[in-house]
Structures are given as C-alpha cells and as structure tokens.
Amino acid sequence: SGDWDIDDNGQADALTDGLMFLRYAFGLSGDSLLNGLISSDSVITSSAEIEAELATVYASSGDIDGNGTVDALSDGLLLLRYLFGLTGNTLTTGVVGDGATVTESAALESYMSGLMPQAPYIQLNGSAFVSHEQATTYNDAGATATDVTDGSVEVFKTGAVDASVAGTYILSYSAADSEGNVSRTLTRSVTVAD
C-alpha cells in the first residue's frame, strides 16, 4: 500500500507498524522482525508479505529526514515517535540524522502525515463469530469507525439476522469519510441454533 500501515489493518500504530519499520531498518527479518508485533486485526501476517511491504515503504519513503539514507536511529525513531503522537522538539531531539535536509518538526510531521492511511479505521464491537439462541431477540454489537480527518464516522451494516430461523447469517460493516475514502469491510458470522 506504500503507507505506514505495514500490516494493512487500516491503522498505522506505533507498537506494530512503527516497530516493524524500526526493526527492518536495523536489518532484522523473518521471526526476529515480527516477534510480538502481529495483532489480531493484522491483515498481512506472513514475514514474506510484511518484508515486501516494508521494502516498498523503506525504498520510497523511509528517508524521513532527507539525508540520503534510511537509518534506524534517525528515520526509524522519528516514525516511532510520530506514531506515538510526539510533536515539536520532542519528536526531533537527538534523532535527526547527520546531513539531514528536513530538520524542522513541522516539515517532518507533514511528511509523515502524508503517508498515514487515509481510509477510516473500522473495528468490530464484540466477536466476529457469534452463537445465538433461536427464537430470542438478536441485538447486534455493531462496529465503530474513526477517521484521521473526520473523527468518528458512521458505520454501514449490510445483512440481517432472522432469529426465528436456524442458520448462519453474515453481517458486513464498512465506513466512508467525507473525502470518499472507504474502510476495509469487516464481517460477523451469526449462527442461530436451538
């Protein structure tokens, strides 16, 4: 995808995507690269796919401070700090590389924000797999979505559960922001049985 959302879950997160980029910049690969970083909502989970995504981002966007090289202790730490929400001097102190052409925090923040996922981040409330007792009212837990521009955005659900009829029902959830960016689609499987 070419953005900071390395695991393609719809959100760039310091403790997954940021650490993957930092470890990759240190030269780690395979299990050493991914150990403890794959979350339950990660879409890309294999080391080969993650490394391919990292190679793309590393080559096209990894030189955050513009000094001509991608360095774990400058670019990697800048990204990690940015994803943790640090700004201003707290973002840049001690990590801008030698020969950097981009040194001001505002310019660095602008560059990194341009590579944030643009679509809303959506997540299910509750489980993706639900067992429901037939002939009782089904109350769906729904989903929530947030967007970098719009904040909380409306979630659209398709599908329905007929709690009077045994079977498996699939509900789908998605969201869109005011700029027309559409989230990934999440599903919930509801099995109605006696």
Regions from the language model: what does each represent?
Residues 7, 65, 125, 144-146, ...:
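Residue-level detector of conserved, well-ordered beta-strand and adjacent loop positions
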Residues 1, 119, 140, 185-187:
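Surface-exposed or flexible loop/turn and strand-edge residues in extracellular/cell-surface modules
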Residues 27, 85, 144-149, 175-177:
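Extracellular acidic, Ser/Thr/Pro-rich low-complexity tracts
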Residues 4, 62, 128-130, 136, ...:
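Flexible, active-site-adjacent loop/turn segments at secondary-structure boundaries
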Residues 130, 148-192:
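Serine/threonine-rich, repeat-prone extracellular segments and beta-strand-based repeat modules
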